[in-house]
């Protein structure tokens, strides 16, 4: 079940949960903080230079030590510019490094999760966890942290200077600070809620837009453009309304902050002016106080805004941690990892060769998000080299069988044996490295034909690639492409037809030279002529390999060593094609019905 967006209360805003990532850059972060403190100290002292210039050079009408004053001012300015450059560079680099680490950690963890996680969480949600949440966390541990350090220390230094210059005048200004904090917090709380709502609406609009593009063919053929368009316009109108609300609060907010700054300035001018007229304060001192009174509000606003944003960012932190701490439904035991390694650190020297014997022993199975048993007390022995075809209606349990063989899911009860040993006694990577899997809906990765085929065998030569293509009668796909193996297939193989993508998927699986081959309705998307060519290749390729073929077209499995007819998670018929046809049972009905439909289609 997809996690809900909700307010989450974590100690210290959840920051301790992400400190392990920041600790990798602790010395850089310490240096950034020190430079931020120095920069805020210098910034708070600039008005003091103006005070000295007005009181000394203007007030006393003298130019002595002016050269030293200018040199000192320029020197400090140059040092600060250099430190600011280094600080900004390091903060940016730290943000990018943290984003990279957070995204790599989350993406790598996703590779280790079972299919159940992806069934329960949509792509947009997972994408937001990897990209958006990690980006917010990286920003928090870099720019937002430096905002608090610089602005917080600047406020402290300014308040110290104000008290040192005139504690009475400082107290009059400080009286406004609690009111300013209350007003800023009041508006910020509402702005955070509105901005959170805007982000949710933006995610919905992005999702709708994506569906509008990917589902363009279905939208046009079902003539539902107006329905989809109305829904999209409703979402954008809602977002406009909420955004206008946020803009209204933003306008009130900045107007109020400006008013508070003006009140502080008025107090300083009123009281400071009286002190200056009565020769109790110099004009330069009044000038520096006015600068401080005006300048303290923006840093105060920034600190409160950052602290307020922590309430929102802690949701990002919690969701990110939920992802990286999600345990896979299918996981190798510590003992297996110790011997065979894990997904990213395999110990191939300990891998035994896979022969291909497969057996189900008293297997019960239900999906993690389901209540009903798909398989109950299921038993099956498949000697190595056997070609097993599985047929049955939708939901009968065909794909469940091969999913358990591939260990995409674990049995609820019982065992799946590979070469006589429980599949859980060896690593998932060991098993997957010996399985070739071709799906009904083929998937190609962005890149060239060569790149895609080498996912089956990274060290494959062009000769090996062409041999695999020849086995599945797919050389024509390459020959008609301008750049041959170097031709780009487009995103998801979008530049190829479904049949062409399927042929390349076959070649990729065969190139891996698997001991177990799984074809999950793999010829369902191929036209009849292509099917005949590839069927001849499959008959050749599966020799000597254990193969499981889930058949959509029963004509493709007539040569199978054994055909299993599955209904409600149980094998109701078993035998060769000729044996099952003689029985005139359920398989006979399926085959006869499909044959009659094929004849009708041919005549039509």
What kind of feature is each model-predicted range?
Residues 76-95, 142, 146-153, 174-198, ...:
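Alpha-helical transmembrane segments of multi-pass membrane proteins
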Residues 24, 28-41, 69, 73-79, ...:
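Transmembrane helices of ABC transporter permease
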Residues 16, 27-48, 52, 69, ...:
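Alpha-helical segments in transporter systems
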Residues 2-6, 96, 104-128, 132-136, ...:
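Short intracellular "coupling" helices and adjacent cytoplasmic loop segments at the cytosolic face
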Residues 1-43, 58-69, 87-91, 95, ...:
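Membrane-integrated ABC transporters
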Residues 19, 23, 27, 115-116, ...:
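An intracellular "coupling" helix at the cytosolic face of ABC transporter transmembrane type-1 domains
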Residues 340-604:
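ABC-type nucleotide-binding domain
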Residues 61-68, 161-175, 245, 249-319, ...:
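Helix-loop-helix
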């Amino acid at each position: 079940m997809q996690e809900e967006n909700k307010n989450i209360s974590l100690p210290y805003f959840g920051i301790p949960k992400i400190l392990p990532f920041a600790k990798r850059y602790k010395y850089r972060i310490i240096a950034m903080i020190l430079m931020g403190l120095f920069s805020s100290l210098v910034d708070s002292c600039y008005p003091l230079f103006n005070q000295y210039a007005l009181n000394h050079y203007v007030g006393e009408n003298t130019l002595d030590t002016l050269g030293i004053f200018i040199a000192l001012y320029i020197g400090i300015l140059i040092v600060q510019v250099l430190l600011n450059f280094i600080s900004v560079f390091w903060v940016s680099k730290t943000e990018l490094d943290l984003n990279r680490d957070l995204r790599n950690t989350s993406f790598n963890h996703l590779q280790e999760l079972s299919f159940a996680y992806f069934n329960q969480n949509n792509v947009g949600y997972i994408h937001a966890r990897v990209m958006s949440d990690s980006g917010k966390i990286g920003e928090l541990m870099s720019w937002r942290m430096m905002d608090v350090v610089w602005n917080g220390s600047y406020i402290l230094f300014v308040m110290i200077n104000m008290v040192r210059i005139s504690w009475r005048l400082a107290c009059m200004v400080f009286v406004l600070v609690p009111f300013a904090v209350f007003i800023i917090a009041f508006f910020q709380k509402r702005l955070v809620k509105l901005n959170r709502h805007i982000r949710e609406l933006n995610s919905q609009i992005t999702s709708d837009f994506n569906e509008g593009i990917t589902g363009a063919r279905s939208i046009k053929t079902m003539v539902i453009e107006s329905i989809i368009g109305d829904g999209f316009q409703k979402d954008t109108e809602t977002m406009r309304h909420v955004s206008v609300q946020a803009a209204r609060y933003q306008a009130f907010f900045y107007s109020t902050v400006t008013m508070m700054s003006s009140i502080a300035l008025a107090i300083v001018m009123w009281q400071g002016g009286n002190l200056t007229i009565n020769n109790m304060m110099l004009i330069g001192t009044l000038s520096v106080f006015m600068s401080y009174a005006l300048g303290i509000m923006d840093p105060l606003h920034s600190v409160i805004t950052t602290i307020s944003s922590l309430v929102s960012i802690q949701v990002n932190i919690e969701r990110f941690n939920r992802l990286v701490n999600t345990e896979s439904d299918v996981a190798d035991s510590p003992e297996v990892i110790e011997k065979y390694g894990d997904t990213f650190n395999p110990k191939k020297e300990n891998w035994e060769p896979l022969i291909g014997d497969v057996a189900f022993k008293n297997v019960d199975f239900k999906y993690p998000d389901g209540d009903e048993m798909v398989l109950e007390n299921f038993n099956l022995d498949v000697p190595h080299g056997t070609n097993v075809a599985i047929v049955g209606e939708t939901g009968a349990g065909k794909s469940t069988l091969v999913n358990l063989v591939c260990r995409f899911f674990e049995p609820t009860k019982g065992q799946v044996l590979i070469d006589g040993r429980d599949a859980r006694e060896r690593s998932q990577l060991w098993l997957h490295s010996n399985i070739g899997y071709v799906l009904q809906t083929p998937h190609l990765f962005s890149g060239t034909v060569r790149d895609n085929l080498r996912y089956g065998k990274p060290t494959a030569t062009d000769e090996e690639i062409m041999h695999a293509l020849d086995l599945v009668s797919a050389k024509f796909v390459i020959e008609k492409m301008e750049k041959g193996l170097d031709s780009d297939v487009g995103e998801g193989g979008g530049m190829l037809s479904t049949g062409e993508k399927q042929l390349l998927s076959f070649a990729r699986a065969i190139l891996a030279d698997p001991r177990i081959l799984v074809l999950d309705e793999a010829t369902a998307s191929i036209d009849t002529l292509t099917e005949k060519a590839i069927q001849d290749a499959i008959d050749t390729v599966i020799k000597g390999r254990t193969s499981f073929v889930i058949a959509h077209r029963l004509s493709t499995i007539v040569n199978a060593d054994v055909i299993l007819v599955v209904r409600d998670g149980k094998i109701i018929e078993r035998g060769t094609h000729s044996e099952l046809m003689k029985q005139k049972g359920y398989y006979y009905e399926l085959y006869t019905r499909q044959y009659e439909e094929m004849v009708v289609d041919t005549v039509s």
